[in-house]
Curated annotation (Swiss-Prot):
Mg(2+) 2 binds at D171, D173, D234. The gene is fen. Residues 1-98 are annotated as: N-domain. The lineage of its organism: Archaea, Methanobacteriati, Methanobacteriota, Stenosarchaea group, Methanomicrobia. PROSITE patterns: XPG_1 (PS00841). This is Flap endonuclease 1. HAMAP family: Fen.
Length: 336
Protein backbone atom coordinates (compact mmCIF):
# COMPACT_ATOMS: atom_id res chain seq x y z
CA UNK A 1 0.00 0.00 0.00
CA UNK A 2 2.97 2.32 0.30
CA UNK A 3 3.54 5.08 2.81
CA UNK A 4 0.54 7.04 4.12
CA UNK A 5 1.34 10.75 4.26
CA UNK A 6 -2.17 11.96 3.48
CA UNK A 7 -2.69 13.70 6.82
CA UNK A 8 0.09 16.23 6.25
CA UNK A 9 -0.24 16.84 2.52
CA UNK A 10 -2.48 19.39 0.84
CA UNK A 11 -4.42 18.22 -2.22
CA UNK A 12 -5.94 20.51 -4.82
CA UNK A 13 -9.18 19.34 -6.39
CA UNK A 14 -9.26 19.79 -10.14
CA UNK A 15 -11.30 18.60 -13.11
CA UNK A 16 -10.17 16.17 -15.79
CA UNK A 17 -10.33 19.04 -18.26
CA UNK A 18 -7.52 20.75 -16.31
CA UNK A 19 -5.28 17.87 -17.41
CA UNK A 20 -6.09 18.16 -21.11
CA UNK A 21 -2.94 18.18 -23.21
CA UNK A 22 -0.86 16.60 -20.43
CA UNK A 23 1.10 13.38 -20.46
CA UNK A 24 0.52 11.29 -17.34
CA UNK A 25 2.63 8.31 -16.24
CA UNK A 26 0.19 5.88 -14.64
CA UNK A 27 1.29 3.50 -11.89
CA UNK A 28 0.19 0.36 -13.73
CA UNK A 29 -0.11 -2.14 -10.88
CA UNK A 30 -1.75 0.40 -8.59
CA UNK A 31 -4.36 1.21 -11.24
CA UNK A 32 -5.07 -2.42 -12.10
CA UNK A 33 -5.60 -3.17 -8.40
CA UNK A 34 -8.10 -0.32 -8.26
CA UNK A 35 -10.03 -1.76 -11.20
CA UNK A 36 -9.94 -5.29 -9.76
CA UNK A 37 -11.13 -4.05 -6.36
CA UNK A 38 -13.79 -1.57 -7.42
CA UNK A 39 -15.31 -2.92 -10.63
CA UNK A 40 -17.36 -5.74 -9.13
CA UNK A 41 -20.86 -7.10 -9.02
CA UNK A 42 -23.13 -6.32 -6.02
CA UNK A 43 -22.05 -9.47 -4.17
CA UNK A 44 -18.38 -8.57 -4.57
CA UNK A 45 -17.69 -11.00 -7.40
CA UNK A 46 -15.38 -9.55 -10.07
CA UNK A 47 -16.52 -9.34 -13.67
CA UNK A 48 -15.70 -12.59 -15.47
CA UNK A 49 -16.03 -14.13 -18.91
CA UNK A 50 -17.78 -17.40 -19.72
CA UNK A 51 -14.67 -19.36 -18.76
CA UNK A 52 -14.38 -17.75 -15.33
CA UNK A 53 -11.48 -15.47 -16.23
CA UNK A 54 -11.52 -12.13 -14.40
CA UNK A 55 -12.21 -9.17 -16.71
CA UNK A 56 -12.75 -6.24 -14.29
CA UNK A 57 -9.35 -4.79 -15.21
CA UNK A 58 -10.10 -4.94 -18.93
CA UNK A 59 -13.38 -3.11 -18.41
CA UNK A 60 -11.56 -0.42 -16.44
CA UNK A 61 -8.81 -0.04 -19.02
CA UNK A 62 -11.17 0.29 -21.97
CA UNK A 63 -13.88 2.55 -20.60
CA UNK A 64 -11.99 4.68 -18.10
CA UNK A 65 -8.90 5.24 -20.20
CA UNK A 66 -11.13 6.13 -23.16
CA UNK A 67 -12.82 8.75 -20.98
CA UNK A 68 -9.43 10.28 -20.15
CA UNK A 69 -8.19 10.28 -23.73
CA UNK A 70 -11.44 11.88 -24.91
CA UNK A 71 -10.70 14.99 -22.84
CA UNK A 72 -7.18 15.23 -24.27
CA UNK A 73 -5.18 13.41 -21.60
CA UNK A 74 -2.31 11.21 -22.79
CA UNK A 75 -1.43 8.26 -20.59
CA UNK A 76 1.54 5.91 -20.40
CA UNK A 77 1.34 2.90 -18.10
CA UNK A 78 4.41 2.02 -16.05
CA UNK A 79 4.68 -1.52 -14.70
CA UNK A 80 6.81 -2.82 -11.83
CA UNK A 81 9.90 -4.87 -12.54
CA UNK A 82 11.96 -6.85 -10.03
CA UNK A 83 11.13 -5.65 -6.50
CA UNK A 84 13.96 -4.50 -4.23
CA UNK A 85 15.14 -7.11 -1.73
CA UNK A 86 14.02 -4.79 1.06
CA UNK A 87 10.42 -5.29 -0.11
CA UNK A 88 10.38 -9.06 0.44
CA UNK A 89 8.80 -8.84 3.89
CA UNK A 90 6.00 -6.58 2.69
CA UNK A 91 5.21 -8.83 -0.27
CA UNK A 92 5.05 -11.88 1.99
CA UNK A 93 2.75 -10.06 4.41
CA UNK A 94 0.45 -9.00 1.56
CA UNK A 95 0.20 -12.59 0.35
CA UNK A 96 -0.78 -13.72 3.84
CA UNK A 97 -3.41 -10.98 4.07
CA UNK A 98 -4.97 -12.07 0.79
CA UNK A 99 -5.03 -15.70 1.93
CA UNK A 100 -6.77 -14.61 5.13
CA UNK A 101 -9.25 -12.56 3.10
CA UNK A 102 -10.02 -15.64 0.96
CA UNK A 103 -10.90 -17.61 4.10
CA UNK A 104 -13.03 -14.75 5.47
CA UNK A 105 -14.78 -14.46 2.11
CA UNK A 106 -15.79 -18.12 2.09
CA UNK A 107 -17.00 -17.86 5.69
CA UNK A 108 -19.02 -14.74 4.86
CA UNK A 109 -20.64 -16.44 1.87
CA UNK A 110 -21.46 -19.53 3.94
CA UNK A 111 -23.07 -17.51 6.75
CA UNK A 112 -24.84 -15.00 4.53
CA UNK A 113 -22.80 -12.06 5.84
CA UNK A 114 -22.03 -9.17 3.48
CA UNK A 115 -19.02 -10.48 1.57
CA UNK A 116 -18.19 -7.43 -0.56
CA UNK A 117 -15.30 -6.06 1.52
CA UNK A 118 -13.66 -9.48 1.82
CA UNK A 119 -14.03 -10.02 -1.92
CA UNK A 120 -12.30 -6.71 -2.63
CA UNK A 121 -9.38 -7.68 -0.40
CA UNK A 122 -8.75 -10.85 -2.46
CA UNK A 123 -7.83 -8.94 -5.64
CA UNK A 124 -4.62 -10.26 -7.19
CA UNK A 125 -2.62 -9.51 -10.31
CA UNK A 126 -1.38 -12.70 -11.94
CA UNK A 127 0.54 -13.22 -15.17
CA UNK A 128 -2.66 -13.65 -17.22
CA UNK A 129 -4.15 -10.40 -15.93
CA UNK A 130 -0.91 -8.54 -16.68
CA UNK A 131 -0.59 -10.11 -20.14
CA UNK A 132 -4.20 -9.30 -21.05
CA UNK A 133 -3.78 -5.73 -19.80
CA UNK A 134 -0.71 -5.13 -21.96
CA UNK A 135 -2.44 -6.73 -24.94
CA UNK A 136 -5.39 -4.35 -24.58
CA UNK A 137 -3.15 -1.31 -24.06
CA UNK A 138 -1.34 -2.21 -27.29
CA UNK A 139 -4.63 -2.45 -29.18
CA UNK A 140 -5.77 0.88 -27.72
CA UNK A 141 -2.55 2.58 -28.84
CA UNK A 142 -1.51 3.40 -25.27
CA UNK A 143 2.24 3.18 -24.55
CA UNK A 144 3.58 1.26 -21.59
CA UNK A 145 6.97 1.19 -19.89
CA UNK A 146 8.57 -1.76 -18.13
CA UNK A 147 10.41 -0.46 -15.08
CA UNK A 148 13.56 -2.28 -13.94
CA UNK A 149 12.24 -2.20 -10.37
CA UNK A 150 9.62 0.03 -8.75
CA UNK A 151 7.06 1.42 -11.20
CA UNK A 152 6.49 4.56 -9.13
CA UNK A 153 10.22 5.29 -9.16
CA UNK A 154 10.29 4.96 -12.95
CA UNK A 155 7.22 7.17 -13.32
CA UNK A 156 8.77 9.80 -11.03
CA UNK A 157 11.99 9.69 -13.08
CA UNK A 158 10.01 10.32 -16.27
CA UNK A 159 8.32 13.30 -14.61
CA UNK A 160 11.61 14.69 -13.28
CA UNK A 161 13.02 14.57 -16.82
CA UNK A 162 9.98 16.45 -18.09
CA UNK A 163 8.83 13.62 -20.35
CA UNK A 164 5.49 13.46 -18.53
CA UNK A 165 3.61 16.17 -16.68
CA UNK A 166 2.18 14.10 -13.82
CA UNK A 167 2.47 10.75 -12.09
CA UNK A 168 -0.88 9.10 -11.37
CA UNK A 169 -1.08 6.90 -8.27
CA UNK A 170 -3.18 6.52 -5.15
CA UNK A 171 -0.02 6.00 -3.10
CA UNK A 172 2.28 8.77 -1.88
CA UNK A 173 5.51 6.91 -2.63
CA UNK A 174 5.83 8.81 -5.91
CA UNK A 175 6.54 11.97 -3.93
CA UNK A 176 9.32 10.26 -1.99
CA UNK A 177 10.79 9.16 -5.31
CA UNK A 178 10.78 12.83 -6.34
CA UNK A 179 7.75 13.15 -8.63
CA UNK A 180 7.18 16.91 -9.04
CA UNK A 181 3.43 16.56 -9.53
CA UNK A 182 1.17 13.68 -8.52
CA UNK A 183 -2.49 13.24 -9.45
CA UNK A 184 -4.74 10.98 -7.39
CA UNK A 185 -8.17 9.52 -8.24
CA UNK A 186 -7.43 9.65 -11.97
CA UNK A 187 -8.84 6.19 -12.67
CA UNK A 188 -11.81 6.48 -10.30
CA UNK A 189 -12.92 10.05 -10.97
CA UNK A 190 -16.67 10.55 -11.18
CA UNK A 191 -19.80 9.61 -9.28
CA UNK A 192 -19.13 6.49 -7.24
CA UNK A 193 -21.35 4.33 -5.06
CA UNK A 194 -20.12 3.74 -1.53
CA UNK A 195 -19.54 0.02 -0.80
CA UNK A 196 -22.50 -1.65 0.91
CA UNK A 197 -24.41 1.66 1.06
CA UNK A 198 -26.99 3.30 -1.15
CA UNK A 199 -24.93 6.48 -1.11
CA UNK A 200 -23.13 8.12 -4.02
CA UNK A 201 -20.22 10.54 -3.77
CA UNK A 202 -18.30 12.62 -6.28
CA UNK A 203 -14.64 11.68 -6.54
CA UNK A 204 -12.63 14.46 -8.23
CA UNK A 205 -8.98 14.25 -9.28
CA UNK A 206 -6.55 15.66 -6.71
CA UNK A 207 -3.15 17.15 -7.44
CA UNK A 208 -0.18 17.34 -5.07
CA UNK A 209 2.72 19.64 -6.03
CA UNK A 210 5.88 18.38 -4.31
CA UNK A 211 7.82 21.67 -4.17
CA UNK A 212 4.80 23.57 -2.85
CA UNK A 213 4.28 20.99 -0.11
CA UNK A 214 7.93 21.00 0.92
CA UNK A 215 7.85 24.79 1.16
CA UNK A 216 4.59 24.80 3.11
CA UNK A 217 5.85 22.18 5.55
CA UNK A 218 9.28 23.80 5.83
CA UNK A 219 11.18 20.61 5.06
CA UNK A 220 13.38 19.12 2.34
CA UNK A 221 12.62 16.08 0.20
CA UNK A 222 15.17 14.11 2.24
CA UNK A 223 13.28 15.03 5.39
CA UNK A 224 9.99 13.98 3.76
CA UNK A 225 11.60 10.62 3.05
CA UNK A 226 12.65 10.37 6.71
CA UNK A 227 9.05 11.13 7.72
CA UNK A 228 7.88 8.34 5.44
CA UNK A 229 10.37 5.89 6.92
CA UNK A 230 9.21 6.78 10.44
CA UNK A 231 5.60 6.12 9.44
CA UNK A 232 6.43 2.89 7.63
CA UNK A 233 7.05 2.15 3.95
CA UNK A 234 6.99 -0.89 1.70
CA UNK A 235 10.52 -1.55 2.97
CA UNK A 236 10.16 -1.15 6.73
CA UNK A 237 7.79 -1.03 9.66
CA UNK A 238 7.27 2.39 11.13
CA UNK A 239 8.03 3.52 14.65
CA UNK A 240 5.39 2.63 17.24
CA UNK A 241 2.76 5.34 17.80
CA UNK A 242 4.27 7.58 15.12
CA UNK A 243 2.00 8.80 12.36
CA UNK A 244 2.70 11.49 9.76
CA UNK A 245 1.81 14.43 12.03
CA UNK A 246 4.07 13.31 14.87
CA UNK A 247 6.80 12.35 12.41
CA UNK A 248 6.68 15.85 10.94
CA UNK A 249 6.94 17.35 14.42
CA UNK A 250 9.93 15.14 15.24
CA UNK A 251 11.74 16.04 12.02
CA UNK A 252 11.18 19.73 12.65
CA UNK A 253 12.58 19.34 16.16
CA UNK A 254 15.58 17.11 15.38
CA UNK A 255 16.33 17.68 11.70
CA UNK A 256 16.97 14.13 10.51
CA UNK A 257 16.01 10.54 11.18
CA UNK A 258 19.33 9.72 12.86
CA UNK A 259 18.73 12.42 15.47
CA UNK A 260 15.10 11.37 15.95
CA UNK A 261 16.09 7.76 16.61
CA UNK A 262 18.75 8.88 19.09
CA UNK A 263 16.26 11.10 20.92
CA UNK A 264 13.60 8.37 21.11
CA UNK A 265 15.98 5.51 21.82
CA UNK A 266 14.51 3.65 18.84
CA UNK A 267 15.97 1.93 15.80
CA UNK A 268 14.86 1.18 12.25
CA UNK A 269 16.70 -1.55 10.42
CA UNK A 270 18.30 -0.58 7.10
CA UNK A 271 16.92 2.96 7.20
CA UNK A 272 19.92 4.40 5.35
CA UNK A 273 19.48 1.85 2.55
CA UNK A 274 15.79 2.70 2.38
CA UNK A 275 16.54 6.41 2.17
CA UNK A 276 19.05 5.73 -0.62
CA UNK A 277 16.48 3.60 -2.46
CA UNK A 278 14.10 6.56 -2.58
CA UNK A 279 16.83 9.01 -3.57
CA UNK A 280 18.54 6.86 -6.20
CA UNK A 281 16.18 4.09 -7.38
CA UNK A 282 16.78 1.78 -10.32
CA UNK A 283 15.27 3.36 -13.46
CA UNK A 284 15.67 3.16 -17.22
CA UNK A 285 15.92 5.79 -19.96
CA UNK A 286 14.78 3.21 -22.52
CA UNK A 287 11.17 4.11 -23.26
CA UNK A 288 9.11 5.84 -25.93
CA UNK A 289 6.04 7.96 -25.28
CA UNK A 290 3.86 7.95 -28.37
CA UNK A 291 0.14 7.48 -28.72
CA UNK A 292 -0.69 5.20 -31.64
CA UNK A 293 -3.80 4.77 -33.75
CA UNK A 294 -6.23 2.44 -31.93
CA UNK A 295 -6.89 -0.92 -33.61
CA UNK A 296 -10.67 -1.02 -33.36
CA UNK A 297 -11.09 -4.52 -34.80
CA UNK A 298 -8.36 -5.88 -32.51
CA UNK A 299 -10.07 -4.36 -29.45
CA UNK A 300 -13.46 -5.78 -30.45
CA UNK A 301 -12.05 -9.17 -31.40
CA UNK A 302 -10.16 -9.61 -28.14
CA UNK A 303 -12.80 -8.36 -25.72
CA UNK A 304 -15.90 -9.68 -27.48
CA UNK A 305 -14.77 -12.91 -29.12
CA UNK A 306 -12.34 -14.02 -26.41
CA UNK A 307 -13.63 -12.37 -23.21
CA UNK A 308 -17.41 -12.21 -23.84
CA UNK A 309 -17.84 -8.44 -23.64
CA UNK A 310 -20.87 -6.76 -25.24
CA UNK A 311 -19.89 -5.98 -28.82
CA UNK A 312 -22.13 -2.93 -29.02
CA UNK A 313 -20.57 -1.28 -25.95
CA UNK A 314 -17.01 -2.22 -26.85
CA UNK A 315 -17.29 -1.05 -30.44
CA UNK A 316 -18.77 2.28 -29.34
CA UNK A 317 -15.91 2.82 -26.88
CA UNK A 318 -13.31 1.82 -29.47
CA UNK A 319 -14.81 4.20 -32.03
CA UNK A 320 -14.77 7.00 -29.43
CA UNK A 321 -11.11 6.25 -28.84
CA UNK A 322 -10.42 6.30 -32.56
CA UNK A 323 -12.30 9.57 -32.99
CA UNK A 324 -10.21 11.12 -30.22
CA UNK A 325 -7.06 10.02 -32.02
CA UNK A 326 -8.19 11.56 -35.31
CA UNK A 327 -9.33 14.85 -33.78
CA UNK A 328 -6.23 15.12 -31.60
CA UNK A 329 -4.07 16.31 -34.49
CA UNK A 330 -5.24 19.89 -34.12
CA UNK A 331 -5.36 20.11 -30.33
CA UNK A 332 -2.48 18.07 -28.91
CA UNK A 333 1.17 18.68 -29.66
CA UNK A 334 2.43 15.16 -28.98
CA UNK A 335 0.14 13.18 -31.25
CA UNK A 336 1.40 11.75 -34.51
Amino acid sequence: MGVDLGDILSKKKISLENLSGCWIAVDGFNTLYQFLSIIRQPDGTPLMDASGRVTSHLSGLLYRMTNLIEVGIRVAFVFDGTPPELKAGTLAARAQMKEAAEIQLQEAIATGVDSFRYAQATARINSEILHDSIRLLDAMGIPYVQAPSEGEAQAAFMAIRGDVDYVASQDYDSLLFGAPRVVRNLAITGRRKMPRKNIYIDVPPEVIILEEELTRLGISREQLIDIGIMCGTDYNRGLPKVGPKRALKLIREHGCLEAVLDALGESIENFREIRELFLHPAVTESYELRMRKPMVDEIVGFLCNERNFSEDRVRKAAERLNASYRSGQSTLERWL
